[in-house]
Amino acid sequence: MSECSTATDLARAVQARETTPQALLEAARRRAEAARDLNALISLNDRADEQAARVQVRLDAGETLPLAGVPIVVKDNLNVIGTRTTCGSRILANYVSPYDATAVERLTGAGAVIIGKANMDEFAMGSSTESSAWGPTLNPWDRERVPGGSSGGSAVAVAANLTPVALGSDTGGSVRQPAAFTGIYGLKPTYGRVSRYGLVAYASSLDQIGPFARSAADLALLMNVLAGHDPRDATSLDAPPAFRPGTPDDLQGLRVGVIREALEGNTPGVEAALNATLDALRGAGATVREVSVPSVQHAIAAYYLIATPEASSNLARYDGMVYGERVSAPDAVSSMTLTREQGFGREVKRRIMLGTYALSSGYYDAYYSKAMKVRRLIAQDFARAFGNVDVLVTPTSPFPAFRRGEKTQDPLAMYAADVDTVAINLAGLPALSVPAGFERVDGVRLPVGVQLIAPPLQDERLVALAGGLEGIGAVRMEVAPAS
């Protein structure tokens, strides 16, 4: 069995008694130790051996488990019982979760073994995984560059083969952009398709948990486990999963729309990868046409005037009284002030202040209310576009991974990194970043991604199309160097 085996292959091997959950766990730990310089993981799961042993007991009792023994990491904003959930922030440095997130519960119920928690931008606010209190995560393709964010640790864990699959969260592109920067798949499901129970909130109307993988079969495997209604999440949809990896036949007769507004400002390598993907689709029997979604030009402005007010509200609880590392002071007000001043990083403070301002008296109508109207307009424009095509295509990012420190002092430049992804969250649509090739920058090959977008609840179609693209050789999948 290859060190680069997929989750599908590993689960099959464990079920067939060709290996054991404990052996897979130990191998994953060795890979994680060898790649420590990437800083992909914040912590290891002390209960992983216990989980592996439980999986073995269930197998010995005759159970069939879809993720039997598969090692996986989850982003550090997902609660795992008995482990720290820090969200990449000092204010939660010692918070130990008393329960499992629904997504984690479903993974372990299917036989997966959680080996650790992945690094992330603080409270998922970032596009580079540089704002974590535990230091930046490095891109394995070029350690001088970022892996994207905010789910950079999860993406690197899969790209560098620490684990075959991982979980992240996507509020404005935080699964798809890191997937593009590291050369793997990253799926942002339809809003409500995967339960958010146990996910620490950034912007509740935008957050969605999504998987990283190196094959369409693994995406299908994970989504069949993760998706489905959860009564503990009021926004959870009752849409039973029916995912499959797909074949080239799924591309025959497909109507593809290329979003015109996403064709400007791309680097030559991104443009070449997009054109190669479109040519491959045409060759497989799809029709390709340009379509316009005019309101997407306002998506970044609307996104930050919706996400930051929600963040301001969600993060108000971290004051040291109930949640957060409390800083001692002579009185309660001083303690709360110091707790937030010392516990939050610069970017989190910036977004809290921006959100508070947008919600303040006299500015609500000018900013938040207007942004919500733009959000509805974006959803309507996407719905109109889908009246003529089955799937929309854009670059995932207009450029490959940028250098560490390049955008940290320019927040607007950092925010613009999500120009191709935020509109999808505003509209609640499913979208998948597909590894589409490489661009050589300063002598280094850097991955680039192409984004497939589908109407609501057509997540299955995206995974099937990924399998079809694999079948015609249009997916460029390579394991990144871990050391």
Curated annotation (Swiss-Prot):
Q: Which UniProt keywords are given for this protein, alphabetically ordered?
A: ATP-binding, Ligase, Nucleotide-binding, Protein biosynthesis
Gene3D superfamilies, sorted = Amidase signature (AS) domain
**Catalytic center at which residues?**
K75, S150, S174
Annotated signal sequence is none
EC numbers, comma separated: 6.3.5.7
Q: What are its GO biological-process terms?
A: translation
Please verify whether the record's keywords include Transcription.
Answer: no
Q: Which SUPFAM superfamilies match?
A: Amidase signature (AS) enzymes (SSF75304)
**What is one term from the GO cellular component aspect held by the record?**
glutamyl-tRNA(Gln) amidotransferase complex
Coiled-coil stretches: none
Which chemical reaction does it catalyze?
L-glutamyl-tRNA(Gln) + L-glutamine + ATP + H2O = L-glutaminyl-tRNA(Gln) + L-glutamate + ADP + phosphate + H(+)
Q: What class of enzyme is it?
A: ligase
What's one Pfam family the UniProt record gives for this protein? Amidase
What Gene Ontology molecular-function terms does this entry list? ATP binding; glutaminyl-tRNA synthase (glutamine-hydrolyzing) activity
Read off the InterPro entries from this record. Answer: Amidase (IPR000120), Amidase_CS (IPR020556), Amidase_dom (IPR023631), AS_sf (IPR036928), GatA (IPR004412)
Known partners and oligomeric status: Heterotrimer of A, B and C subunits.
What does this protein's UniProt record list under function? Answer: Allows the formation of correctly charged Gln-tRNA(Gln) through the transamidation of misacylated Glu-tRNA(Gln) in organisms which lack glutaminyl-tRNA synthetase. The reaction takes place in the presence of glutamine and ATP through an activated gamma-phospho-Glu-tRNA(Gln).
- Belongs to which family? Belongs to the amidase family. GatA subfamily.
Protein's name according to its UniProt entry: Glutamyl-tRNA(Gln) amidotransferase subunit A
List the source organism.
Answer: Deinococcus geothermalis (strain DSM 11300 / CIP 105573 / AG-3a)
